[in-house]
Regions:
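Canonical tetratricopeptide repeat
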Residues: 8, 43, 80, 114, ...
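Residue-level recognition of tetratricopeptide repeat
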Residues: 11, 46, 83, 117, ...
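Structural motif corresponding to the intra-repeat A-B loop/turn of tetratricopeptide repeats
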Residues: 16, 51, 88, 122, ...
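Canonical positions in the second alpha-helix
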Residues: 29-30, 63-67, 100-101, 134-135, ...
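Short coil turns that delineate tetratricopeptide repeat
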Residues: 34-35, 69-72, 106, 140, ...
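TPR alpha-solenoid repeat register
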Residues: 40, 74-77, 111, 145, ...
Length: 227
């Protein structure tokens, strides 16, 4: 079997979204396999990311980034590293990776959205909104930024009309996203439209049943509405 076809089975499993099976395939490769080690690390990093095993993902994504190989692949892994760092509270590392990406011009709208998310986690609301705005100037249909800015505007009780418009657009693009449904429900809550708020928040909870924030939002609506 040629080197460039050894990994085809694992790649196919990954594209079919069978991430557990793809992971097992790549982990099961013999140590003396002639397959490209960096390519194996790349797919292991992707599989672990999809399975939300972020600490495991970091190990392999960092290997790809430090290899200095395929430029597009390195940039993709930098972006995933930044998102994982942000989610796990390692904000300085997230900032470092995101700024490196900005220097290259890679996926600019998504990078701006990620920086905005990090800023929100740091309670820097003005910087957060500024980067969401920059993201939407680059890509007016970026779902993360539509949803993120809409939620922040609602949270700050600033321009609820625009917040509603942004969140509606996000839900239209991603109707099965618990995050987008939650944000839209929260805007309706801020507008005092509790029936609509509960409708979307409950949809969000059905998709992401263990989400504490969604549960808290539903509790807030019920307290206000008397249900």
């Amino acid at each position: 079997m040629q080197n460039n076809t050894i990994l085809n089975e694992g790649k196919l499993l990954y594209t079919q979204k069978k991430y557990d099976k793809a992971l097992a395939f790549f982990l099961g490769l013999p140590t003396d396999s002639p397959a490209d080690k960096i390519e194996v690390s790349y797919y292991l990093g992707l599989c672990y990311t999809k399975l939300e095993r972020y600490d495991d993902a970091l190990l392999f994504l960092e290997q790809v980034v430090t290899s200095g190989g395929n430029f597009e692949r390195v940039l993709q892994c930098r972006f995933l590293l930044a998102v994982i760092y942000a989610l796990s509270g390692r904000r300085r590392l997230a900032d470092f990776e995101l700024n490196k990406l900005l220097e290259t011009g890679y996926m600019t709208a998504s990078v701006y959205a990620a920086i905005a998310f990090v800023a929100w986690e740091q309670n820097d609301t003005e910087r957060c909104m500024s980067y969401y705005e920059q993201s939407l100037r680059k890509d007016p249909d970026n779902v993360s930024s539509l949803n993120g800015l809409g939620y922040v505007l609602a949270y700050q009780e600033k321009d609820l009309t625009r917040a509603l418009s942004l969140c509606k657009q996000a839900v239209k693009s991603a109707p099965k996203s618990a995050a987008c449904l939650d944000s839209l429900g929260w805007v309706y809550y801020k507008l005092g439209l509790y029936k609509d708020a509960l409708q979307y928040l409950q949809q969000a909870e059905q998709i992401d049943t263990m989400n504490v924030e969604i549960a808290e939002h539903i509790k807030s609506v019920r307290l206000k509405s008397g249900h």
